């Protein structure tokens, strides 16, 4: 009978009590001795019944040697009970809620029935139980005191009498608690409080605390420190009387009390970390013991941190052997190959089983042995099941079938290639090894175009390479991890690889028209030479004579014909910026490939560059597969490099030098900038700079200087006039996108300009008012603040060089500080989303809990998308009718078709206009990513079977229309199956929506007016191809889309921070780049957000186009507190008087004059009789009042309304220049009265509190709006003719701070278009669905053009809002989303605390996701392991055919 097997479905965590320990223990430890002679002492802590780690003796329990014995726990019977150190807080809770006399609950259990189970005991223990009377025995419950000096001691304070609660007494109290009480308080029966006090503790097996014996008998020996702790524990336990009885309130001998405390401390150190080697630590009472010069180790110390058991041993994967070396480039290698040094190949070994078909191939390895490469090192003999070293074999040793030969690595073996940090799944790829025979080479070599997978370069990067051993692992590696699988990026949906640098320039030069001196025109022989290293099928040159000339386009077309595609796009080479300064050949302005023939244009970055979405390699991959695209990249690269080697290409200093005339023109431009900067300085010195609302004079001055010192676009003119674009290598690299940019070219040739650090000029931080030692204090010239006039080629002065290095130093420090934050954020994202897996319905779920009804709302794989343009979106009604309405046949079907196209257009506009209105920067566009490029399929079908324009009858046209209509109707059945399509079962609404964008595109591209020259057979083929590609583009079952989303978002976010030093020297770095992502992913509340903003549209259309009116409204909503309007204030203790004689403070004697005038001008505002002796004197800032448009009258009225217990006097508003506006606020006696109307003593604290309230008083505006400025928006709207019009003259208000509700109450603000960046504020006002959309838009806004595919953003948003509340990606959010997945939360952080809480709650952890199965030693159910494979062994046996039987049949 065969034994069955089963997978672990769930794990339950419980508190282990005495009975559990006794049941699991195989022996009882009674003595502290380790050994008796050479054998373990019986009953000692090294008893052989607990296992063995020594080859001298076997385990008595299982009779196995040390390699096979897993170890067995023992027990130590305590003479006196001890508290379980992990559950001290739980013990305290139970003591607070149960009667110490009878064990009945003190609290009313019905009050806590509505709470979830884990919260009941916690809430009950937090209630007031001191002095309560027990419902059963009427005993008054005492006060439970936890000793502040001792972590383990509890005291009872009952009517002033304080008694110590020893563990034995606590155990007796807990033994009276009924199971019914335990369950009603939310705990499981398995978590009875009696288990929290132990009489028998478990001793761990010897295998986890091994000893190292350095000799036999009396020789030296060394043991694990934890054994010493156990020894002390046993010895101290023997000092306690066995029958010790402790009665509550009775004192025990001091020596016994100390021994009990020491035992408790030892048990704590045995389980948990020792926090200190001193007597106590910070008053916590956690004492520490010392083993030599270090704290004692513990069992729980092995779990947390990177080196702990969980992350290092259980979640981490270790390989037997691995190689690591520096990488360098080698263009002769394919993208899927890696050059491997021969010294490494002779060290790493590959295990290969000898079979009939490979014994002849393996025999040379066996004969070469270790002497010659390729050889082998060991042989595993199947008959004897033993391993033999190849050098120690006898002469008669034979290699037989079934043996395993450990041979050297040879060319053609597959290997894993990895670069850390592994932020994406493409960071581990499988390559084919090419052994480098040169013994001097010791580096890995790879194709330059392959670096994109690993984000690697050749500046000293090191990578890892290891070879899978078994046949199964080699096959799995090649199928699942081959680099061809990573060619299309999951993050951006575009190709990862392409031509870079030299090969990009070479492709451009080869395909140019009319190259100088005809360098890309060659004869037959030279053309054949270019193909020599492409490793493709050579094109046929038989039709060319030796005298025929071929240009570069013809040569490239010979290669492209092997994978015919159609391509049309403007190249990077053509730019409107360069057009005024250089002549473009008309044939190079647009690149067009027709059926594999390069008709016109050039190949540059946009066509063949790395990461070019929609480029040539992307199209080849979509039509012919990624393997063919990689071959084409290599072949094109070889063509380009071979051409560059022959024709020559270089960048020299001559390419960087300006002509004297151009240099003079550059200097004139720079002088103009410096003059403008000097004018701004003069305005500052004369006080003529008036900053707008929200900016200080200094900030506005710095902003003016930054704008004035920016290089204008016309600085390119002298550069372009001094170079020859046809021959200048530097310009050609920039213009083709191979390397560099316009700012780089300007910095090299013209000037560097203003250096910015954190978006600011260099600040005077060297000393007071000084930027560097080279400039005097308070210098205002632009050069003193980081403006560099010279270029790199001209050379920098000392201060200019220092300014440039300042930015580099800031970036390096910023990178170092951000690495840890982004790395941990990546890890939290991985753990937070890893349980999200696609099921058989293409839903995303966590175990059985739904996250997305359909992955990405359309069920598509992000790697299977193309960018297409929807032609109808930007057309007006009349244009749409002219272009798409078929009028050749009078039929209601074509009216229906046009009506459907118009509805599709309007629906598209409605959706994306709404998105535009509620996002800061996302504008409507007619370009979208879809799984099928219908226009390309139609073009390919027509080119492959050209029929010309043929007349078709009405029946054929109607038939084609019906075919398209039926196809669009049935397209959503792709998500279900063919059976449901045949039955025409109802389609769920969400599936119809998923296919809506694709159906719109099909109706546009297959409209009747566009398919007149297509036959019905061609139409059928087109629809079949569309369906096939659409089906292949669906996400696979079992895909771990959560991890894909985490990688796709975290990697560019991490790279955004780490690449700060790669930005332009004058671009600077914004240190707040990491703040906003942390706010989003941490789900911070509104009050904790540092960078929240609002965008407010105005209700009145006329005001919306008037910047002045918009600014007035912005002023009115900006929060102005009284404190912002004050220059200085004084709190005076003086008696009110209107004469100079009684003024206590002579410095303010002049106030009497305006106070007298105030009383004369305001006869109704005479001082009251109850004025106290406290006065608040304030001087107002007239400049701020003018800028904020606030009058003195409005300030006074606001203060009087909010503070009636004061008497306010003020000077006139229109004072002379230099004379401030003064307000005196006298406190009245009522401000110093209690609610009982009794007079309080005059107190300075009360007066200070009144001052604080006055300063924080709101004068005007909406709370939360710190600043408000007018910004110009670009938005779309549909006019009366149905045309989409772009509006550029709309003004809106952008605020710093958020308060949606307050903004909705303002009559000038349109409440329907309020946009806030705050997720919390949006959630509070609009609900969870609005918060979900806000998460998506905020991540997209933060990441900008580096953002990933929106499906990954949807994954984040749906997971964070799945519970109905916005949960963070932090530990707290994971606890809320997956409270039952204890193993996952334990793997993330704080494993000891997570395990403790799980045991208290008796948590049941179902095994799902990735971390939990991995920790349990099983295979996660994802990817190819998601689907179960059922094999009929009986059928295979019955139908098995041997080679001989097949030959007989033939």
From Swiss-Prot:
Reactions accelerated catalytically: RNA(n) + a ribonucleoside 5'-triphosphate = RNA(n+1) + diphosphate
EC number assigned by the record: 2.7.7.6
Free-text function comment from the UniProt entry: Catalytic component of the DNA-directed RNA polymerase (RNAP) that catalyzes the transcription in the cytoplasm of viral DNA into RNA using the four ribonucleoside triphosphates as substrates. Forms the polymerase active center together with RPB2. Part of the core element with the central large cleft, the clamp element that moves to open and close the cleft and the jaws that are thought to grab the incoming DNA template.
Enzyme class: transferase
Gene3D superfamilies cross-referenced by the UniProt entry: 1.10.132.30, 2.40.40.20, 3.30.1360.140, 6.10.250.2940, RNA polymerase ii (3.30.1490.180), RNA polymerase II, clamp domain (4.10.860.120), RNA polymerase Rpb1, domain 3 (1.10.274.100)
Keywords of this entry: DNA-directed RNA polymerase, Nucleotidyltransferase, Transcription, Transferase, Viral transcription, Virion
Entry comment, domain topic: Lacks the typical C-terminal domain (CTD).
Protein's cellular compartments: Virion
Gene Ontology terms describing biological process: DNA-templated transcription; viral transcription
Entry-linked PANTHER family: DNA-DIRECTED RNA POLYMERASE (PTHR19376), DNA-DIRECTED RNA POLYMERASE I SUBUNIT RPA1 (PTHR19376:SF11)
GO cellular component term, pick one: DNA-directed RNA polymerase complex
Family indicated by similarity: Belongs to the RNA polymerase beta' chain family.
Expression induction: Expressed in the late phase of the viral replicative cycle.
Protein name, entry field: DNA-directed RNA polymerase RPB1 homolog
Keyword Transferase: yes
InterPro entries: DNA-dir_RpoC_beta_prime (IPR045867), RNA_pol_asu (IPR000722), RNA_pol_N (IPR006592), RNA_pol_Rpb1_1 (IPR007080), RNA_pol_Rpb1_3 (IPR007066), RNA_pol_Rpb1_3_sf (IPR042102), RNA_pol_Rpb1_4 (IPR007083), RNA_pol_Rpb1_5 (IPR007081)
SMART domains noted in UniProt: RPOLA_N
Subunit structure: Part of the viral DNA-directed RNA polymerase that consists of 8 polII-like subunits (RPB1, RPB2, RPB3, RPB5, RPB6, RPB7, RPB9, RPB10), a capping enzyme and a termination factor.
Molecular function in Gene Ontology: DNA binding; DNA-directed RNA polymerase activity
Main location: virion
